[in-house]
């Protein structure tokens, strides 16, 4: 998300952060990664607003953006030795099972597998 001046914003439900601080660390890293990877700018460049509903024409890209942000977040958390946050993220994604984790997003299983694969890399 961007503010009215085009500055990056991250909006997170505080309940999510208080309910599971470990998952909250992952979530914040994940959202930061969307900004650093250029995903947010891409959504605001116009194409994300075309079509019968928001993001309709970039829905295949949205799935990959989520996986890329997960990968980036795991790498950040590994670098700071926050293995509990990585585990919490995987467990949270597994709770979605074969259902998508959001509109046009990967399934929980896909995201959990991606998190585990990234965490296992050196």
Model feature map: region roles:
Residues 39-66:
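Post-HEXXH active-site segment of zinc metalloproteases
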Residues 1-9:
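Catalytic zinc-binding patch centered on the HExxH motif and its immediate surroundings
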Residues 78-122:
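Long, well-structured alpha-helical subdomains associated
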Residues 16, 22-25, 31-48, 79-81:
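Catalytic Zn2+-binding segment of zinc metalloproteases
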Residues 14-18, 54-63, 99-102:
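Second-shell loop/turn segments in exported
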């Amino acid at each position: 998300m961007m503010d009215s001046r085009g500055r990056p914003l991250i909006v997170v439900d505080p309940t999510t952060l208080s309910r599971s601080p470990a998952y909250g660390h992952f979530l914040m890293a994940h959202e930061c990664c969307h900004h650093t990877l250029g995903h947010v700018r891409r959504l605001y460049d116009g194409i994300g607003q075309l079509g019968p509903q928001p993001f309709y024409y970039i829905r295949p890209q949205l799935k990959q953006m989520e996986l890329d942000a997960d990968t980036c977040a795991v790498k950040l958390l590994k670098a700071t030795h926050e293995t509990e946050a990585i585990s919490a993220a995987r467990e949270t994604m597994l709770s979605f099972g074969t259902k998508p984790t959001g509109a046009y997003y990967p399934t929980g299983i896909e995201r959990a597998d991606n998190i585990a694969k990234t965490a296992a890399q050196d």
